[in-house]
Curated annotation (Swiss-Prot):
Region of interest (Disordered), ranges: 33-66, 88-116
Cellular compartment(s): Secreted
Coiled-coil region list: none
GO cellular component term of the entry, any: extracellular space
Name assigned to this protein: Four-jointed box protein 1
Source organism (scientific name): Homo sapiens
Residues listed as glycosylation sites in the UniProt record: N248
Amino acid sequence: MGRRMRGAAATAGLWLLALGSLLALWGGLLPPRTELPASRPPEDRLPRRPARSGGPAPAPRFPLPPPLAWDARGGSLKTFRALLTLAAGADGPPRQSRSEPRWHVSARQPRPEESAAVHGGVFWSRGLEEQVPPGFSEAQAAAWLEAARGARMVALERGGCGRSSNRLARFADGTRACVRYGINPEQIQGEALSYYLARLLGLQRHVPPLALARVEARGAQWAQVQEELRAAHWTEGSVVSLTRWLPNLTDVVVPAPWRSEDGRLRPLRDAGGELANLSQAELVDLVQWTDLILFDYLTANFDRLVSNLFSLQWDPRVMQRATSNLHRGPGGALVFLDNEAGLVHGYRVAGMWDKYNEPLLQSVCVFRERTARRVLELHRGQDAAARLLRLYRRHEPRFPELAALADPHAQLLQRRLDFLAKHILHCKAKYGRRSGT
């Protein structure tokens, strides 16, 4: 019995010795145990560099990774796997989390640049309006008109003024003017009325100053250009227009919102994000284009952007070429040239062209506030033709030599103003914001 007990004890001792050896061997392979530091707030997790004397601490060369997420129960929720992830991305900028909203343009959250471009949802901002190049000021126009009416011509030259029947006049003081001889008197009448309508709407900065003159071979103004008059085959006594000649004009291409190749217009409005990614210069351009579209609708001018829309049926790239009768001055202002098709002739054929003019107008839902106010004022007064003719009569001495606006055309002008006013109010009701309106 004793021998058996001693054998069992020896066997147990050998097993315990073997087990202890294994544990010692295993313990030697394990790294020393590291204690977690005491819990501290997340902002203290990274060591701080001592500030240099005489100034603030220098900014880190690379952006520091974001602090680890903190568990209020005391300890980091990030694991070694998370630390590996941070280490792998340390050479680049921190990734954007899925929950963080990305910066994009939408109707609900417009970019600051777009918000600054429009106020009240439908009006160009005052800041943009102030950046529109000045064009022709009232004082400049008045001075030029006074000089042109009394100036003597020393040359009449072909070219530089559009149609072959027109001439480029040079005055004794060296200034020049385009002399437009209409195929019929209504073209000169339409151009003169268009100029004064532009003044009535506050758009005169875009339309060259215009004066009327009578062709009189024996008159003082024409005395030195007798030969040129005979070569031009102008009828004695005809009324022509003198408009200020502008050097260094450049062609203008339709901006992207209307550069359609499929005949469909893309509406220009603030709410739809159409102003996204446009530069300041492009926005300033659009301010001028919206005025042009309103002006051409009111005058029923078919010889500018509307003619491009008409040509799309056989020329899908016409919108990528220069727009007729529209140029840019050296200062950047758009110049609305050759408005002979406006009002009189344009009104006679309005039924043919309004299928282009009306959709073009309805593609615009952002306006210059001053222009919109003038339109609404003329709509409320219901006296647009009377006010236009008063302005024309007051500033043009030869007003009686051309027929006044016929009653049917006067009524059509008022109807077009009413249509435009309703469109502005519709845009304001649909896209306007009460704050700032």
